[in-house]
């Protein structure tokens, strides 16, 4: 950037940006290696990151190990499934840095544009359903329970990711958003479509780890 050609207001803003980027350079090998694993190359440290790095917190190592294990678990989730679940949580939490990261990683793992779009759509639908059905569950009134939902859910029919995985993503997001009725319903559906409790356990654990990662990075 040629600072001498910028208007005064823009000049001050650019100088502040440069100073901030230099000030917030993260001098922690473990943390930087985690960012590299996630293919995050342009990141401005959050206050939470700075707190951990400044104190040389042991949690940084825990976080890196947990994230690595979650995304590379091949016993019950393959790489593509794990990254797509992580993407769903990033979308749910509106954290663009990880949304872009997991989109790229998902494509590297073989996910198609249609599968990625479906995960985004599924996450949006779950945000709708989680609020609606949590309200019904809270109120426990016949009137609300018996009223037709009137919510279009065509993406649940013949999903490109398959019924089992679509329901699995729905379950994870419902767990993140705290909808008991939705969690119970989707857990039963995942099992009915041939999945196992072990896979469900790993999927929800993956979602919880990514939620924790976002708490630090955002």
Language-model features and meaning:
Residues 168-171, 175-218:
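Preference for long, well-ordered alpha-helical segments
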Residues 20-81, 92-160, 189-192, 208, ...:
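Acidic, glycine/proline-rich low-complexity segments that act as flexible tails and inter-domain linkers
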Residues 1, 109, 182:
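Functionally engaged cysteine thiol sites
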Residues 85-102, 173-185:
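Short, thiol/selenol-centered motifs that function as redox-active sites or metal-ligating centers
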Residues 149-181:
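Acidic/histidine-rich alpha-helical segments that form the ligand environment
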Residues 1-19:
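Short, Lys/Arg-enriched N-terminal segments with co-localized hydrophobic residues
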């Amino acid at each position: 950037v040629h600072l001498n050609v910028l208007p005064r207001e823009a000049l001050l803003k650019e100088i502040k940006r440069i100073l901030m980027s230099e000030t917030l350079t993260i001098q922690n090998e473990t943390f930087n290696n985690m960012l590299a694993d996630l293919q995050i190359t342009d990141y401005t440290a959050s206050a939470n990151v700075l707190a951990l790095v400044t104190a040389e917190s042991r949690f940084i190592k825990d976080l890196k190990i947990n994230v690595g294990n979650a995304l590379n678990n091949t016993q019950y989730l393959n790489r593509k499934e794990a990254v797509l679940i992580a993407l769903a949580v990033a979308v749910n939490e509106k954290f663009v840095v990880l949304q872009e990261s997991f989109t790229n990683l998902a494509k590297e793992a073989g996910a198609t544009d249609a599968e990625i779009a479906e995960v985004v759509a599924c996450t949006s639908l779950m945000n709708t359903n989680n609020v609606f059905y949590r309200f019904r569950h809270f109120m426990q009134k016949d009137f609300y329970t018996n009223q037709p939902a009137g919510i279009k859910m065509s993406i649940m029919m013949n999903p490109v990711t398959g019924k089992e995985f679509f329901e699995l993503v729905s379950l994870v997001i419902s767990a993140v958003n705290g909808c008991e009725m939705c969690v119970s319903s989707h857990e039963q559906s995942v099992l009915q479509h041939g999945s196992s409790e072990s896979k469900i356990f790993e999927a929800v654990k993956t979602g919880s780890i990514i939620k924790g990662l976002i708490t630090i990075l955002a």
